Amino acid sequence: MPELVWLNPHDTVFPPTTSALEDPNGLLAVGGDLSPARLIAAYKKGIFPWFDDSQPILWWSPDPRMVLLPQNLHLGKTLKKLAKKQAFKITIDTHFSDVMQGCAQPRADQDGTWITTDMENAYLELHKLGYAHSIEAWQDGELVGGLYGIAINRVFYGESMFSKVSGASKIAFANLATQLASWGFYAIDCQVATEYLASFGAAEMPRVEFEQILQQSLQSQPPKCQIEGWQNSWNMPDYGQLF
């Protein structure tokens, strides 16, 4: 039976993902830190941190993995109707910290939040370095929804989303997926299965297949947005794609 590995605080090496536990699914390692170098090394291998204030840093690589191929984005009739109403203005990388704080707010079905202050600070640093990005949904000048994640070459690793108004995060996500498809991204990592993500066309795949996509991404030419910047390359209409 695989044993849980405590990370060496002096390097950013992770154990093979094949050594991750089956129960809980994907728990791979404990400890380390949330430095940019360690986080980037983790995401390149499909590993992500997920823990709360009462726990040490926990690192995960679940099998199977929930993934959306951007070209497979599915939009239901209700979402298409909402998009055509142009109810939300969509922006990119204008209020990263506010989006994280929105995602960190307690939810009705949760006792607390896994987006701790340390996590906020770590991802804000990744945002400053050009790896972490936010997509914002606005209504009447108020931030009412959005999401954030990490982009490394041609894979976007989704982290969390929030909505204060019904449909806000869905419109933000749909526009992100549409833009990523046009930029030639290979995949959007959704981590673990939910009905919400499945409604967009995301599906589970074996971890080994997901890791093959990661390797293809790392070996490919950087996308336009990485070279020119996300804000400079973003070409969705102000009120989103009408689909």
UniProtKB/Swiss-Prot annotation:
GO terms for molecular function: leucyl-tRNA--protein transferase activity. Keywords: Acyltransferase, Cytoplasm, Transferase. It comes from the Bacteria. It is an enzyme of class 2 (transferase). Its main location: cytoplasm. Its EC number is 2.3.2.6. GO terms for biological process: protein catabolic process. It is found in: Cytoplasm. It catalyses: N-terminal L-lysyl-[protein] + L-leucyl-tRNA(Leu) = N-terminal L-leucyl-L-lysyl-[protein] + tRNA(Leu) + H(+); N-terminal L-arginyl-[protein] + L-leucyl-tRNA(Leu) = N-terminal L-leucyl-L-arginyl-[protein] + tRNA(Leu) + H(+); L-phenylalanyl-tRNA(Phe) + an N-terminal L-alpha-aminoacyl-[protein] = an N-terminal L-phenylalanyl-L-alpha-aminoacyl-[protein] + tRNA(Phe). GO terms for cellular component: cytoplasm. InterPro entries: Acyl_CoA_acyltransferase, Leu/Phe-tRNA_Trfase, Leu/Phe-tRNA_Trfase_C, Leu/Phe-tRNA_Trfase_N. Functions in the N-end rule pathway of protein degradation where it conjugates Leu, Phe and, less efficiently, Met from aminoacyl-tRNAs to the N-termini of proteins containing an N-terminal arginine or lysine. Belongs to the L/F-transferase family. This is Leucyl/phenylalanyl-tRNA--protein transferase. It comes from Saccharophagus degradans (strain 2-40 / ATCC 43961 / DSM 17024).
